[in-house]
């Protein structure tokens, strides 16, 4: 048996006792975590990235909702959506260049 010393786990940073002959610096709780959460293989890494992106998007939307609820400020959201398209007043589709008979362009 080896000497027992107190070290910090590299994953959760909790102190635990381990034998000096044991090479890993991971506590027993972290060893029970499924391998795909620790392993950095490409397939597991892409799954992790996908889950992270999904969680990030959910948190982003939740932040918008909580901002509206906490501040009762819906104007910023409306203004943001209005900025997506700015109609040009001189655009012929709006007929604003022809005021002679109040008809759309082509009829005046």
Swiss-Prot record:
Q: Which domain of life is it from?
A: Viruses
Q: Which UniProt keywords apply?
A: Lipoprotein, Myristate
Does the UniProt entry include the keyword Lipoprotein?
yes
Q: Tell me which residues bear the N-myristoyl glycine lipid modification.
A: 2
Q: Spell out the protein name for this chain.
A: Uncharacterized protein L806
């Amino acid at each position: 048996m080896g000497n027992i010393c107190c070290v910090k786990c590299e994953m959760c940073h909790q102190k635990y006792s381990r034998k000096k002959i044991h090479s890993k610096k991971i506590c027993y709780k972290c060893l029970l975590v499924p391998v795909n959460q620790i392993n950095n293989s490409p397939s597991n890494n892409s799954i992790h990235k996908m889950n992270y992106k999904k969680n990030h998007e959910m948190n982003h939307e939740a932040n918008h909702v909580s901002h509206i609820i906490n501040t009762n400020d819906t104007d910023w959201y409306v203004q943001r959506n209005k900025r997506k398209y700015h109609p040009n007043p001189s655009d012929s589709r709006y007929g604003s260049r022809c005021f002679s008979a109040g008809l759309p362009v082509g009829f005046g």
